[in-house]
A protein has these predicted regions:
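Alpha-helical support elements that line or immediately flank enzyme active sites
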Residues: 50-63, 86-109, 149-154, 215-224
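Active-site lining segments of carbohydrate-active enzymes
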Residues: 136-209, 218
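A conserved hydrophobic secondary-structure block that centers on an alpha-helix together
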Residues: 38-41, 83-87, 94-99, 103-129, ...
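Active-site-adjacent structural elements in folded domains
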Residues: 35-39, 65-86, 129-135, 179-206, ...
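Acidic/polar, glycine-enriched structural segments that form the non-catalytic walls/loops
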Residues: 1-84, 118, 125-128, 158, ...
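Structural helix-adjacent loops and short alpha-helical linkers that scaffold large soluble proteins
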Residues: 39-44, 61-67, 103-113, 152-166, ...
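Catalytic cores of carbohydrate-active enzymes
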Residues: 127, 218, 224-260
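Long, well-ordered core segments of solenoidal/helical folds
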Residues: 59, 105-127, 163-181, 189-195, ...
Length: 260
């Protein structure tokens, strides 16, 4: 309650609705004005700026104005000099939204990566679908990885790159999590083997998503001069080839015997 009271006092110190309405409009105009489009078609402009607005609804600030936030370990932590973010539906957003943020919100991208690292320190792995500080484990892949790597390769922020890479590697090596151990052993995830974290059996999709994320880890490691790690993950990234069925020209699931 004390944190909420501080937030209210800091963000809305006066009882003046019209003032804050005007400030909110100005803030949104400033945000949406980061990209200017040209053309005479008003419908196209409405569609574009509506979509841009939607892209800015999440991730969301999760820390109080004094930096306090509730971590995945159920403890209160402090973000000193940065803002903690949550609401990361990374399977949905790593392809387009997060690359967009590197152009429209680079300072926030830095804080998002720091939020990932903090989550790893408190939970032992990077977030998959983080919502208000907790992990939902919805969707697949470890797609905090491409977000981190994109920021690193673009030279964004002052986050700890070594710690970020460590977090990526640790997450990619959780053998008991959603078929990762089988992915490493067989070069793909078999559809007929399930466990606590692999019960939904998205074996083909997981294999493809993991291979992409592994390629990203390899690229970051290479840039950091860690060629042994880069070689390991470049090799893993080729696992996508193991689910290509030349007989049908489709990517297809395989069982633990290798049969499509």
């Amino acid at each position: 309650m004390e944190g909420a009271a501080k937030n209210l006092q800091t963000e809305v110190p006066e009882n003046d609705f019209d003032k804050y309405l005007a400030e909110t409009k100005a803030n949104w105009n400033r945000q949406l004005g980061k990209i200017e489009i040209k053309g005479d078609n008003e419908n196209d402009k409405v569609n574009f700026y509506t979509a841009l607005y939607h892209s800015m609804i999440a991730p969301t600030i999760y820390s109080d104005v004094d930096g306090a936030y509730y971590g995945p370990d159920k403890k209160v932590h402090q973000a000193n000099g940065w803002v903690n973010y949550s609401t990361f539906s990374l399977w949905d957003t790593y392809r387009a939204a997060h690359p967009l943020f590197t152009y429209t919100e680079p300072e926030r991208v830095n804080d998002m990566v720091k939020s990932f690292i903090a989550f790893y320190e408190q939970n032992g792995r990077l977030p998959v679908w983080n919502f208000y500080g907790s992990e939902t484990d919805m969707m697949i892949g470890y797609h905090a990885v491409p977000v981190i790597v994109d920021a690193y390769l673009k030279g964004i922020g002052d986050f700890d790159a070594k710690k970020a890479l460590d977090a990526c590697i640790a997450t990619a090596n959780l053998d008991n999590y959603r078929g990762i151990g089988l992915y490493k052993e067989l070069g793909y995830i078999p559809y007929n083997v399930t466990d606590h974290y692999n019960a939904e059996n998205w074996s083909l999709s997981k294999t493809l998503e993991y291979a992409f994320d592994d390629y990203c880890i390899a690229e970051m490691a290479k840039k950091m001069g860690k060629q042994d790690i880069a070689d390991e993950f470049y090799k893993r990234s080729q696992n996508y080839k193991n689910v290509y069925n030349p007989a049908t020209s489709f990517m297809q699931p395989r069982d633990d015997k290798g049969i499509f």
